[in-house]
From Swiss-Prot:
The keyword NAD is annotated on this UniProt entry: no
Identification of the protein by name: 3-O-alpha-D-mannopyranosyl-alpha-D-mannopyranose xylosylphosphotransferase
Compartment(s) where it occurs, according to its Swiss-Prot or TrEMBL record: Golgi apparatus membrane
Organism taxonomic ancestry: Eukaryota, Fungi, Dikarya, Basidiomycota, Agaricomycotina
Region (Disordered) residue spans: 1-47
Keyword tags: Carbohydrate metabolism, Glycoprotein, Glycosyltransferase, Golgi apparatus, Manganese, Membrane, Transferase, Transmembrane, Transmembrane helix, Xylose metabolism
Species of the source: Cryptococcus neoformans var. neoformans serotype D (strain JEC21 / ATCC MYA-565) (Filobasidiella neoformans)
Length: 864
């Protein structure tokens, strides 16, 4: 039985162009009679003769009409006739607004839409730092900088994923293919890339680590922090593999307090006048960095070495309290990080000034390089899971106290858990270690696309799966096992308690939106684990392997959203009640499984996986070509979320065909709804199928995917034009300034989650809005799309010089290897291994990045 649907709203009339004039046919003030078509305008002499001619005695038709109206209507415009008319209008208004309110077509057209309250899918760029941040560092080892302020509260604000246009979204999710082309789909995504880096030979860093090791009574391996010059070549490899498809590179770097006066030498003398103004006015005298060139020279000689006597006491206090010192790679020239700067070699101004006629596409779309210190990314949410903002004083006090415990950090897992707070980060990100390298050309779609989602590279060995419980002997594990177990324990409290696959040692694809969801969902555990300065500390339940948590969270959120779409949004709205399963739902389930009148005694149903064409050879390439996007180049795809959920991993020797069938026990899966024919709340059935009896939910997904045919997921969705009215504002609630995108509860456990439509729409739709629930579900699912894939990748633990030679020969002899990971586990021949590594790096990626100090404007340019 189809659900009741409100009639669709008519599209609003197109407003006229406010810039049109009476001479434009599109203008409401245009008079055709004033400019007869095809008649030439009279000459000036003709105009003069017309003006001088006597007026014609005949009256115009319009004047006759006005005269007749005045003669017949004016006698009736008296108080005796107007008063009843006004009273009748007032009475109608009172009845309409207070007694029997009814919807008006004009009101419906002017009603605000949720889309008008969504934030942009693009995260805003960060503000400029105080001082000229485009200057190079005075000392290549360290950089004096003014940290960016914390994100504006409330933070994090969930932003929508890049949705396909509505007509493309409907075709894609319902039919598994789309007629939309490049014009409708828009430009291809670009990617951001992130790296963590530390120089373990820096004496300031070593002294700090030694001090905190003694305080915390821990001993961490030195090899975790050794520098082999990997970072610069890892960045070169990404530039070579994805030319023209990268937006921003992000470096996350260690930092220290500003020691005055020792660190005064690290402040560029040219910015002192501007800093004096800022310090004297409490920071209110800031100017844009480009104005520094016009700043007055308030010091005697800006090229001389700064001394405490050459700056004011207020500036000295300002530097001590607000500035910090950044540890930097010595090869990094900070003046060539931003292609939007006219002085950048790849800026169009510089290119034209050099007399070049055309620019290589890789240089025309060259990425920006941003840096962020640990101080700038270590923040905690300023909102709760329901979007309520904390009081300002309480928030600042809490964060400051937490930072005292968390920083400085020597724990890469703690730092990685803050990646989503990077200023100016895009939504789609490749997260790399500095010892990860791309060896072959890649497309953006090898990592992410709006059509198929993020690409995950799982390990498919049953014995490598991650356990779902915290083990006490791994809480202070110097490796990653403790962080993996803790991450799966968190997931198993929120989702089904189960083993989950490990992932390959390759760059990870994460989205900032999902990172923000995790930061809210598991905020207590992540806030505590981030205070573990070393992995060996015994705080809480251990580290959290954030990249693995985000990868597995995507898989679980997709499954949860699929089941919610069918259980709550589809089956729960069949009878128009919007919140329960009833007799109409039972009829729909019987129809799904092909029941007849003689099948009332059926208790169990065997479901078989149907044939699917989503990943058939050539289909994906055709879809990307149609969209005008580049198809994957270096990836083999094993599973698409557009085919449901990933089958579980099997032990060695088990029959793979068992993953192609399952049994639905109707009594066990549906409980009293089936055994006693009782109505139940759809939100309760959601928990039963998704979490209490997860095998029931998994089997229902297989049945619905099969019912959808060879492509698409049409069987999950409610019928077209099914609309649900969002709840009105509650007493004391404020009208939302912005709306988060469609998403399900962010509670840390499933028991406390409320999956009812009214609760979900109360935070993701406008009060009283008529929500197209079918499109809503498709947008919800867009957020969590994924592909399981594999690439030809190698991961090696460097042991000795002889081992390094064998590794490099093996890679050179196999051109199919697309991703390489190399871990420093050197036991002997350290200097020789380091020499071999750097020789091979330079042989493999000789072209320097533009931000390297010894970049050559001739030798290191791109050529067709």
């Amino acid at each position: 039985m189809p659900p009741t649907a409100l009639p669709p709203l008519r599209p609003p009339a197109q407003p006229y162009d406010s810039y049109s004039s009476s001479l434009s046919p599109s203008s409401p003030r245009f008079h055709p009679a004033s400019a007869p078509h095809g008649r030439r305008a009279p000459s000036p002499s003709r105009l003069e003769s017309l003006l001088d001619a006597p007026h014609a005695p005949a009256r115009s038709p319009s004047r006759k009409i006005r005269s007749a109206l005045s003669r017949h209507i004016r006698p009736h415009l008296t108080p005796r006739t107007l008063t009843p008319l006004l009273l009748w209008t007032l009475a109608l208004w009172l009845v309409h607004h207070f007694l029997f309110p009814f919807s008006s077509p004009l009101a419906a057209l002017s009603r605000p839409k949720a889309e008008q309250h969504f934030l942009s899918t693009t995260f805003p760029p960060p503000p400029q730092r105080l001082g000229d941040d485009r200057l190079d560092s005075v000392d290549p080892r360290w950089r004096a900088f003014h940290p960016l302020p914390p994100p504006e509260p409330p933070f994090p604000r969930l932003r929508p994923t890049r949705f396909l246009p509505p007509q493309c979204l409907e075709q894609w999710f319902a039919d598994g293919e789309t007629l939309c082309g490049a014009k409708e789909m828009g430009e291809e995504e670009t990617l951001d890339a992130t790296w963590l880096w530390v120089n373990g030979s820096d004496h300031r860093w070593r002294d700090s680590m030694a001090e905190w090791r003694e305080k915390e009574n821990v001993n961490s391996p030195e090899r975790h922090f050794r520098e082999q010059n990997e970072l610069v070549h890892s960045m070169r490899s990404v530039l070579d593999a994805l030319p023209g498809h990268l937006r921003t590179f992000h470096l996350i770097l260690a930092d220290y307090p500003f020691n005055y006066p020792e660190d005064l030498d690290l402040v560029p003398p040219s910015i002192i006048p501007d800093l004096e103004v800022a310090a004297s006015k409490g920071g209110q005298g800031r100017r844009h960095p480009r104005e520094l060139a016009r700043a007055p020279a308030s010091v005697s000689n800006l090229t001389e070495r700064l001394t405490p006597e050459s700056i004011s006491p207020s500036l000295a206090r300002h530097l001590q309290s607000e500035w910090r010192i950044l540890q930097t790679p010595t090869w990094l020239d900070f003046s060539r990080r931003d292609p939007s700067d006219p002085s950048h070699p790849f800026h169009p101004y510089s290119v034209s000034k050099a007399g070049e006629m055309r620019q290589h596409y890789a240089e025309a779309s060259y990425p920006t390089l941003r840096y962020a210190s640990h101080w700038e990314v270590f923040h905690i949410p300023s909102v709760d899971r329901d979007g309520r903002e904390e009081l300002m004083g309480e928030r600042e006090w809490r964060e400051n106290e937490w930072k005292k415990k968390a920083l400085p950090s020597f724990n890469s897992m703690a730092i990685e858990s803050r990646i989503g707070w990077l200023p100016g980060l895009a939504d789609a990100i490749i997260a790399l270690n500095d010892d990860f390298f791309l060896l072959r050309p890649h497309a953006v779609s090898d990592f992410h696309s709006p059509l198929y989602g993020s690409v995950i590279r799982f390990e498919h060995s049953y014995n490598q799966q991650v356990k779902p419980d915290v083990e006490k002997n791994h809480i202070n594990d110097p490796g990653e096992m403790g962080g993996l177990y803790h991450a799966n324990a968190l997931l198993s409290r929120r989702f089904p308690h189960r083993l989950r696959p490990y992932f390959a040692h390759v760059p990870k694809v994460i989205t900032r939106g999902l990172h923000h969801e995790a930061s809210l969902m598991f905020q207590e555990a992540l806030t505590l684990s981030s205070t573990r300065k070393f992995r060996e500390m015994k705080i809480g339940e251990g580290d959290v392997q954030m990249q693995w948590l985000l990868t597995s969270l995507r898989v679980e959120r997709w499954r949860e959203a699929l089941l919610w779409t069918w259980v709550v949004a589809n089956m729960g709205t069949l009878s128009g009640s919007h919140d329960r399963w009833d007799s109409d739902t039972r009829s729909a389930i019987k129809h799904l499984f092909g029941f007849t009148e003689d099948d009332d005694d059926v208790v169990k149903i065997e479901v078989h996986r149907g044939e699917r064409w989503t990943l058939e050879p050539g289909r994906m390439q055709k879809v990307f070509h149609q969209a005008g996007w580049e198809a994957p180049k270096a990836t083999e795809f094993l599973f698409s979320s557009m085919d449901g959920i990933m089958p579980p991993l099997l032990r060695s020797g088990e029959d793979p065909s068992q993953n192609d069938r399952c049994i639905i026990d109707l009594n066990r899966c549906f409980g009293v709804f089936w055994t006693r024919q009782e109505d139940v709340l759809s939100a309760d059935m959601m928990k039963r199928l998704t979490f209490q009896y997860p095998e029931c939910g998994d089997c229902m997904i297989m049945a619905l995917v099969t019912a959808s045919g060879t492509l698409g997921l049409n069987a999950f969705f409610p019928p077209k034009e099914t609309t649900i009215t969002a709840p009105e504002l509650g007493p004391g609630d404020a009208y939302p300034k912005y709306l988060p995108p469609p998403h399900l509860p962010l509670t840390p456990t499933w028991h406390e989650a409320d999956y009812s439509l009214s609760n979900i729409l109360s935070t993701t739709a406008l009060p009283g809005e008529q929500v197209d629930i079918r499109q809503y579900c498709m947008r919800l699912l867009s957020r969590y799309l994924y592909l399981d894939a594999k690439s030809v990748s190698h991961f090696h633990m460097m042991k000795s010089a002889e081992h390094a030679k064998r590794v490099f020969k093996m890679i050179q002899d196999n051109p199919k290897v697309s991703i390489l990971g190399m871990n420093d586990d050197i036991e002997s021949d350290y200097d020789e291994v380091k020499r071999l590594m750097n020789e091979w790096f330079e042989m493999r990626w000789p072209r320097k990045a533009v931000w390297e100090r010894d970049w050559d404007p001739v030798k290191d340019r791109y050529h067709d």
